[in-house]
Amino acid sequence: MVIEAIVTRLDAAFEQIEATPDSRESQQQRETILQWLDHASAEGYRLGLVTTLPAARFSALFEGQFGTASLDRFSVVVADAGQPSVDARQHPYDVALQALGVPRECAAAVASSERERREAEIYGMSRCVQIADVARAAAPLGHC
């Protein structure tokens, strides 16, 4: 099976960017995320993003740091992912994948930290990598 969609978790990067917006590390995070977004969009992947940030805070942070056009590349954004939902049995990745119309076997996860990558792996995403590795390699995620 071919990877059709990528669900992204970038909370660790967002925390760093919020805490030290002018630092070299935050600048590198922004550049890596933008490079990855450009690459994933050019490859034709459907993109979803899962974040624990509340929707208004996420929107202000993302648009302020990356621009509205970058946010528009995501087909779905699942905000408040750390809060218990009405249907607590539904994982935030389930919500994103359902909205993207892709089974987890045909989706990859890209994360900004090892903890986020492990979470996606435990959830059962077919491929789980850190954003810095994907951006450095600049290679398609390939097959499941």
PLM ranges: what are they?
Residues A55-A108:
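Substrate-recognition "cap/lid" segment bordering the active-site pocket of phosphatases
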